[in-house]
Amino acid sequence: MIKNTFLGIGPMSVEIIDSLDYFSKKFKKKIMLICSRNQIESDKLGSGYVNNFSTKQFSQYVKKKKNKLLIMSRDHCGPFKRDGNKKNLKKEIENCKISLLDDIINDFKILHIDTSECGQGKYDVAKELMDYCNEKAKNNDKKIFFEFGCEDHGILTNFKKFKKDAKFLSNFPNRQFIVCQTGSLVKSIFQIGQFDIETVKIMKNI
């Protein structure tokens, strides 16, 4: 497990990446750069909108900063999670594997697997993707950690579903995070949700 992670922020522009580099060095905080597939993507799948970076180019840009406090991470990788034309499930899984392999080779450390669009097959697809990642990480002598799950923002987590997610994730020794919702929801610069501390306490115990 990667300890003492401070915050996860999407690298939506080069300016944001540079600012996070400055902040993490100044305050000595670990920052996770959580890249959606729209933002940063394998060149085999068209690259991303952030400076038109491919996964490799993004990784090279971050590594040039020589900042071990910046942790490259993948956010919401799963079938039907990228904008554009949607493929059939088999093709979507193939594309996810292409994307994840590039992540692993280019030293992304935390991989968020989100199969929430796969219906009743979500755990089977997640297992396939996570087993694939572990195999490729081992073959390439890389160390990775998993985040798993997805919920609609601003809606409190369903405890029954959360328990199932937690049980599934417990099968992977290199787990890092599980997704749960607290009721908090920020839109623009405003907090329009309601943080529920009692719900958070229950989920923590689960």
Annotate each predicted stretch with a short phrase.
Residues 73, 112, 147-150, 179:
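Generic enzyme active-site microenvironment
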Residues 1-92, 98-100, 107-109:
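Alpha/beta catalytic barrel-like cores
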Residues 3-13, 109, 122-142, 152-206:
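Active-site capping/gating regions of soluble enzymes
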Residues 17-24, 54-66, 95-104, 126-139, ...:
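Short amphipathic alpha-helices and their capping/turn segments at secondary-structure boundaries
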Residues 13-15, 37-39, 76-80, 115-119, ...:
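Active-site-proximal loop/turn and secondary-structure-junction residues that shape catalytic pockets
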Residues 93-94, 117-127:
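Membrane-interface helix-loop-helix junctions at boundaries between adjacent transmembrane segments
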Residues 31-33, 111-116, 178:
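Hydrophobic residues within beta-strands of alpha/beta enzymes
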Residues 104-116, 120:
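A glycine-rich phosphate/pyrophosphate-binding beta-strand-loop-alpha-helix module
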